[in-house]
Curated annotation (Swiss-Prot):
Heterotrimer of A, B and C subunits. The lineage of its organism: Bacteria, Pseudomonadati, Spirochaetota, Spirochaetia, Spirochaetales. This is Glutamyl-tRNA(Gln) amidotransferase subunit C. It catalyses: L-glutamyl-tRNA(Gln) + L-glutamine + ATP + H2O = L-glutaminyl-tRNA(Gln) + L-glutamate + ADP + phosphate + H(+); L-aspartyl-tRNA(Asn) + L-glutamine + ATP + H2O = L-asparaginyl-tRNA(Asn) + L-glutamate + ADP + phosphate + 2 H(+). Keywords: ATP-binding, Ligase, Nucleotide-binding, Protein biosynthesis. It comes from Borreliella burgdorferi (strain ATCC 35210 / DSM 4680 / CIP 102532 / B31) (Borrelia burgdorferi). The gene is gatC. GO terms for biological process: regulation of translational fidelity; translation. Belongs to the GatC family. GO terms for molecular function: asparaginyl-tRNA synthase (glutamine-hydrolyzing) activity; ATP binding; glutaminyl-tRNA synthase (glutamine-hydrolyzing) activity.
Length: 91
């Protein structure tokens, strides 16, 4: 994998790593990419009929507890106006 793709991935993730951690990340990232490439070589025929279910067998939606905006703000220092800001992707 080209170094530029790895550098861009690290930049977009907003993660700062030491050189040792970066080397570990690159090694693991390359393994994942190789596995994805290997999986993409399989020929799979999709059978939509096999996935059909009656509506009555589907689960009901339940309203569950969620984090408050204040708790979410604490997860990142790039939270602005209700959104997480991210690096510019398109140049």
């Amino acid at each position: 994998m080209k170094d530029i793709h790895l550098k861009n991935s690290l930049k977009l993730s907003l993660v700062t790593l030491s050189r040792e951690s970066e080397d570990k990340f690159i090694s693991k990232f390359e393994k994942v990419i190789k596995l994805v490439n290997k999986i993409s070589n399989f020929e799979v025929q999709i059978n939509f009929n096999a996935n059909k279910k009656k509506i009555s067998t589907l689960r009901e939606d339940k309203v569950e507890f969620s984090l408050s905006i204040e708790a979410i703000k604490k997860l990142s220092n790039s939270f602005l106006d209700g959104y997480f800001s991210s690096p510019k992707i398109l140049e």
